[in-house]
């Protein structure tokens, strides 16, 4: 598949994953020899086996099926009555071709004799590179920014860093916390995603609060001198907690909380000197409280406004005053002015975070989709803005991801 078709598929992936009816496609894909039977079986087993996971894997694998893969896929859509998607892809493909001039369409310009003679060249006034938008049409400008150590973190090592995923699913009965069905789907998606971004991924499941802290300390005490970055992902129930800088807390399987502030503080310059000056990224999929956001009315025809196929569950637990002393004492002890830290929350403080038992959490599912499509060309903050926009329009109840950004530079993931 050529690069233009590949870019088109990535731009359209969110809509395809939302609308593609994969069950109708298998025979058509086989008859047009786009895929072989064992490939179809692999796609059907992708993720949780849900329609969305199958659709996502199909689009990813389609990129590897040759130069005619996209037009053949469009024909398969037409064969199975999915005319709107077929027309959408065909129109966008034609528009992309028309917007790119070819040599045969260019008219030669004949220079007048008087201007063929070289003139004295005048120095051009330097023009600043626009780095504010996050997206870059000029590949050269993007690569120049990636390689500028004054403007962007340089992730050049292989692997570029450690990634620890703590996935708490089953909680003790005394905690009163429900099993987080669907979290294993989130965990697997993130394991694959950060592996593809050149991280060494380690997964630890069902940890008590004490074991969570020990796992984090163990990671912080490793030598990160030859690495460029560090990622911590926590999938658990959560609650509000008093704080100085980073709100919220996450629960161990014993029902005891660990404040996000404590987690971040484990990786500060004093506790983890080998990560000094390097980006430390934290992704928290847990509730920030117990409020359910009904949103407010806006005029919209977006398909994402419809609620998911199954009832989502919150990762919510009410605010506990008993956490106040715990968090306050910990925060006062030695938390320095934060730098090179980025904390991404699945929801706005005080509100619940929704998780679908069959397809995983809204936040992780969207994060995975956005990283797949845009991580090669956009920086971390731009990616998370896309995630926030996509998650905010889902479901009957609303959810608004957010972040605390103490990075000093732009961060582009290593994708090749």
From Swiss-Prot:
Record GO terms (molecular function): cysteine-type endopeptidase activity; enzyme activator activity; identical protein binding; peptidase activity; protein kinase binding; SH3 domain binding
Post-translation changes: Cleavages at Asp-315 by granzyme B and at Asp-330 by caspase-3 generate the two active subunits. Caspase-8 and -10 can also be involved in these processing events.
Keyword Hydrolase recorded: yes
Phosphoserine: modified positions: 302, 307, 310
Enzyme class: hydrolase
Transmembrane segments: none
Annotated region described as Disordered, given as residue ranges: 294-320
Activity regulation behaviour: Inhibited by the effector protein NleF that is produced by pathogenic E.coli; this inhibits apoptosis. Inhibited by BIRC6; following inhibition of BIRC6-caspase binding by DIABLO/SMAC, BIRC6 is subjected to caspase cleavage, leading to an increase in active caspases.
The protein's Enzyme Commission number: 3.4.22.62
Residues of the propeptide: 316-330
Active site: 237, 287
One GO cellular component term noted in the UniProt record for this chain: nucleus
Domain CARD: 1-92
Keyword flag Ligase: no
PTM-bearing positions, type Phosphothreonine: 125
Tissues where the protein occurs: Ubiquitous, with highest expression in the heart, moderate expression in liver, skeletal muscle, and pancreas. Low levels in all other tissues. Within the heart, specifically expressed in myocytes.
Name under which the protein is recorded: Caspase-9
Annotated source species: Homo sapiens
């Amino acid at each position: 598949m050529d690069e233009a078709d590949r870019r088109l598929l990535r731009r359209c992936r969110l809509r395809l994953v939302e609308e593609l009816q994969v069950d109708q496609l298998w025979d058509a894909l086989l008859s047009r020899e786009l895929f072989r039977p064992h490939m179809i079986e692999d796609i059907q087993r992708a993720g949780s086996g849900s329609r969305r996971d199958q659709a996502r894997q199909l689009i990813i694998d389609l990129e590897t099926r040759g130069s005619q893969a996209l037009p053949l896929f469009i024909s398969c859509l037409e064969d199975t009555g999915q005319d709107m998607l077929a027309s959408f892809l065909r129109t966008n493909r034609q528009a992309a071709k028309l917007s790119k001039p070819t040599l045969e369409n260019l008219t030669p310009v004949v220079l007048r004799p008087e201007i063929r003679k070289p003139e004295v060249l005048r120095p051009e006034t330097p023009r600043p590179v626009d780095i504010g938008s996050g997206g870059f049409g000029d590949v050269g400008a993007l690569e120049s920014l990636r390689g500028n150590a004054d403007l962007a973190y340089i992730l050049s090592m292989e692997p570029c860093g450690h990634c620890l995923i703590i996935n708490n699913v089953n909680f003790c009965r005394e905690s009163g916390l429900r099993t987080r069905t669907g979290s294993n789907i989130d965990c697997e998606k993130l394991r694959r995603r950060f592996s593809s971004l050149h991280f060494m991924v380690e997964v630890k499941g069902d940890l008590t609060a004490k074991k969570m802290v020990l796992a984090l300390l163990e990671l912080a005490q490793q030598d990160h001198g030859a690495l460029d970055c560090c990622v911590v992902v926590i999938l658990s129930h959560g609650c509000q907690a008093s704080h100085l800088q980073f709100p919220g807390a996450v629960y161990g399987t014993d029902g005891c909380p660990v404040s996000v502030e404590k987690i971040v503080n484990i990786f500060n310059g004093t506790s983890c000197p080998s990560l000094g000056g390097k980006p430390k990224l934290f992704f928290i999929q847990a509730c920030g409280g117990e409020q359910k956001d009904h949103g407010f009315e806006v005029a919209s025809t977006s398909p994402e406004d419809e609620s998911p196929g199954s009832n989502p569950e919150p990762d919510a637990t009410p605010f506990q005053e008993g956490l106040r002393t715990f968090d306050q004492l910990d925060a006062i002890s030695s938390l320095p002015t934060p730098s090179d830290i980025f904390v991404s929350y699945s929801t706005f403080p005080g509100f619940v975070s929704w998780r679908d038992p069959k397809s995983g959490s809204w936040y992780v599912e969207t994060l995975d989709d956005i990283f797949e499509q845009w991580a090669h060309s956009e920086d971390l903050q731009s990616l998370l803005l896309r995630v926030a926009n996509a998650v905010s329009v889902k479901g009957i109840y609303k959810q608004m991801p957010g972040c605390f950004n103490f990075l000093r530079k732009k961060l582009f993931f290593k994708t090749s």
